[in-house]
Design a protein with these regions (language model features):
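Compositionally biased, low-structure terminal segments
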Residues: 7-8, 53
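Soluble ligand-binding/transfer domains with enclosed cavities or grooves
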Residues: 25-238
Length: 238
């Protein structure tokens, strides 16, 4: 009897320890995980990632976030997705070469993506060394059978000569769409963009009111080719 009681005590102790450990894990809030993701992304700002080590460090936290806050399909998140986003960290080379490098023409601390609910977005960024704002337009649509994926096709690449002093950069996107840029120009003709820029896929893994985490890749099923973006909601004065 004493032996049985001893083993019962061991089992109960083990269960209590496991429950206690689970409680500790459960107390880590979504806000705390997001804060860690943001702090780590900010520490990587302006840096390339040729060996994917920075992305892998972020992905551990992203996995924890998704376990704590599972996401509905991206089609149900389009209202949240809409609006201007600031790139805290992600790829800094969009020329089709090694995405682990940093394109010297990119102003790494002023990269924005402005998403419109109607199925298009603009990448907005000042061109380093030139008095010009680049606005690359892409159209997107959900991918059947892939609930978090958007297929992207680039369509136009306008720009604005000079930097407006009275509006945030991301507001140029709506003006570009309306053909009302204050000093509009064409960086690359539309037919060249449509023929040669192609497109790709965005895997929207997390969206809320102030944070967005997405992956960009060339193929729908190639996770090894994906590159992560950590974004926060762009706001005036922020």
């Amino acid at each position: 009897m004493r032996t049985l009681a001893f083993f019962q005590t061991l089992v109960m102790t083990g269960l209590l320890v496991a429950a206690s450990a689970a409680s500790v894990v459960a107390t880590r809030s979504v806000a705390a995980i997001k804060a860690d993701i943001l702090a780590l992304a900010q520490s990587f700002a302006g840096q390339g990632d040729p060996d994917f080590s920075r992305q892998e460090a972020l992905e551990k936290l992203v996995a924890e976030l998704l376990a704590a806050a599972p996401q509905p399909p991206v089609a149900a998140r389009l209202d949240l997705l809409a609006g201007p986003w600031y790139q805290v960290w992600g790829p800094y080379d969009y020329r089709g070469g090694d995405r682990g490098t940093v394109d010297p023409k990119i102003t790494v601390d002023e990269i924005y993506q402005v998403v419109f609910r109607d199925g298009y977005y603009y990448n907005v960024n000042p061109v380093r060394g030139k008095s010009r704002i680049a606005l690359l337009r892409g159209e997107f649509q959900p991918v059947p059978g892939y609930p978090d994926m958007l297929k992207v096709r680039f369509t136009r690449f306008p720009g604005n000569k000079g930097r407006p002093e009275d509006i945030p950069l991301w507001e140029l996107a709506a003006l570009a769409e309306a053909g009302e840029l204050p000093a509009g120009t064409t960086i690359v003709p539309g037919f060249i963009v449509r023929w040669f820029f192609g497109g790709g896929f965005l895997r929207e893994v997390y969206t809320d009111a102030d944070m967005r985490i997405t992956y960009a890749g060339d193929r729908v099923d190639d996770r090894a080719d994906e590159h992560i973006y950590i974004m926060t909601r762009a706001r005036s004065g922020a």
